[in-house]
Amino acid sequence: MQAFTVHKGLVAPMDRANVDTDAIIPKQFLKSIQRSGFGPNLFDEWRYLDKGEPGQESVVRKPNPDFVLNQPRYQGASILLTRENFGCGSSREHAPWALGQYGFRVLIAPSFADIFFNNCFKNGILPIVLPESVVARLFDEVHGFVGYQLTIDLPRQVVIKADGTELPFEVQAFRKYCLVNGFDDIGLTLRHADKIKAFEAERLAKMPWLGQRLL
């Protein structure tokens, strides 16, 4: 997983509350057994005028010109600003996969659904909770300024605006540690690979029948 320390990026505003995971990545795309390739179908039913299906090339589809991520001023955005209860609905991990593969590294909202919130950290995305009044001001600024960017300093736990204003945010210490070091669950486990191998060797020495294969 890519480490996260300081990130500066363009902000895209999604002025919707209660965006659920089926809106983030519709159910028909969950059939894939691969963990990649979901970025083109992020917000699929809002992003395109035609219905998408797995394996369909996005270049042949009809983009919705009114959807925020299709507007030229927000191309290349890596920070998504949105409203309360983002990521509600089913607990599909495909939702943060799609967001990350599109290019988002940071999500900012007044609140997130719990399971989605946890899944973001496990997939290298930083979800930041800010007060609703602060989020509302950020929406005004993003809409009023083309090319609006923010800097996210995770070690210091602040969002930095272009004028230098710092907006503090909270993050649980273990989640912060994992993001800063680029550790997902597998990466954390592999840090203890030597101990795991030693345990397995000791266990097999004491109980060799556990190593026998069934025919």
Curated annotation (Swiss-Prot):
InterPro entries: 3-IsopropMal_deHydase_ssu (IPR004431), Aconitase/3IPM_dehydase_swvl (IPR015928), AconitaseA/IPMdHydase_ssu_swvl (IPR000573), IPMI_Swivel (IPR033940), LeuD (IPR050075). Pathway: Amino-acid biosynthesis; L-leucine biosynthesis; L-leucine from 3-methyl-2-oxobutanoate: step 2/4. It comes from the Bacteria. It is an enzyme of class 4 (lyase). GO terms for molecular function: 3-isopropylmalate dehydratase activity. GO terms for cellular component: 3-isopropylmalate dehydratase complex. Transmembrane segments: none annotated. Its EC number is 4.2.1.33. The keyword Amino-acid biosynthesis applies. One of its GO terms (biological process) is L-leucine biosynthetic process. It catalyses: (2R,3S)-3-isopropylmalate = (2S)-2-isopropylmalate. Gene3D superfamilies: Aconitase, domain 4. It holds the Pfam family Aconitase_C. Keywords: Amino-acid biosynthesis, Branched-chain amino acid biosynthesis, Leucine biosynthesis, Lyase. The keyword Amino-acid biosynthesis applies. Belongs to the LeuD family. LeuD type 1 subfamily. Catalyzes the isomerization between 2-isopropylmalate and 3-isopropylmalate, via the formation of 2-isopropylmaleate. Heterodimer of LeuC and LeuD. This is 3-isopropylmalate dehydratase small subunit.
